[in-house]
């Protein structure tokens, strides 16, 4: 499965690397950034107390877009990985981890509308833990979860700053490539259970969940002042087959202030709402997450403020 996912990621971007430029028209446009954001604190005989800490987040973003005779193919890779080290002896704490790949093929319908087919993949690089309860209790890893989405629809591009893709025919697969998490029903897959007709027969949890519905993705990338840029991505998904009014929400925002050609300051937020993703309460007897999941309307929210270096590639 890992080979399949990495193949999908590389096909979309490698094609652009070997594309030849037309003598009259540049068919491919490529741009990207690589960055490293960090902070550090150190205390020696500090009366008020404090913890030595080192925090870093690495990012890689790349776009490879093709356009010719009313046909376009837009490919975007967005990745980040970050850790915090306290006292430089304890196990590092993961603060950011993202792999997102989208590939959209569009055929011009009108001046501002395109027929579209979009493939999207989302997962993470490293293991994730519930650090508030037990730093050895793994709650995520590569492909646990992993999301693969394929949708057919229409894209509206009114200007160079905004686009919206609506795909009323969309299939989505949620992958949980971890047996322990699958048995608990993590990330909405069917949990393992005992056969009601035979209490000794354990039915294993599923490693994938399949959905069919509608997906809307709106993107905004606009300069709001000199050296200040704001970008936002809102993704909504409705599952036709199970409570279609329970809309999944994934909303990412980032404000970037460029100090100079390589130094920048940024603040990023990420909000997720998915009714089907269960949460596990803490068992007071063990101080560990309970084996009984709780489904419900919990909003996931993350905010990252960082200062660092960024270079164009």
Where are these regions (language model features)?
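Bacterial Sec-dependent N-terminal signal peptides
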Residues: 1-25
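Transmembrane beta-strand segments of Gram-negative outer membrane beta-barrel proteins
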Residues: 24-40, 71-73
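Outer-membrane beta-barrel "beta-signal"
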Residues: 299-313
């Amino acid at each position: 499965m890992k080979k399949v996912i990495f193949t999908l990621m590389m096909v979309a971007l490698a094609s652009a690397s070997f594309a030849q430029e037309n003598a009259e028209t540049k068919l491919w446009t490529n741009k990207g950034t690589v960055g490293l954001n960090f902070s550090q604190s150190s205390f020696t005989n500090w009366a008020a107390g404090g913890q030595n800490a080192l925090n870093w987040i690495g990012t890689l973003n790349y776009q490879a877009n093709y356009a010719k005779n009313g046909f376009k193919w837009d490919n975007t890779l967005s990745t980040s990985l970050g850790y915090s080290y306290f006292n430089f002896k304890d196990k590092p704490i993961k603060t950011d981890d993202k792999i997102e790949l989208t590939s959209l093929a569009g055929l011009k319908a009108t001046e501002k509308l395109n027929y579209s087919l979009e493939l999207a993949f989302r997962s993470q690089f490293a293991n994730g833990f519930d650090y508030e309860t037990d730093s050895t209790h793994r709650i995520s890893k590569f492909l646990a979860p992993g999301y693969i989405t394929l949708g057919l629809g229409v894209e509206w591009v009114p200007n160079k700053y905004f686009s919206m893709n609506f795909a009323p025919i969309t299939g989505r697969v949620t992958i949980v490539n971890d047996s322990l998490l699958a048995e608990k029903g993590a990330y909405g897959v069917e949990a393992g259970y005992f056969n009601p007709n035979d209490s000794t027969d354990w039915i294993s949890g599923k490693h994938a969940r399949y959905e069919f519905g509608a997906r809307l993705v709106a993107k905004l990338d606009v300069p709001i002042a000199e050296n200040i840029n704001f970008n936002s991505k809102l993704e909504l998904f409705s599952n036709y087959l199970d409570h279609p009014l329970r809309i999944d929400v994934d909303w990412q925002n980032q404000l970037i202030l460029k100090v100079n050609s390589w130094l920048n300051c940024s603040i990023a937020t990420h909000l997720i709402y998915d009714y089907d993703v269960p949460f596990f309460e803490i068992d007071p007897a063990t101080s560990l997450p309970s084996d009984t999941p709780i489904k419900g309307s919990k909003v996931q929210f993350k905010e990252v403020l960082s200062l660092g270096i960024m270079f164009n590639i």
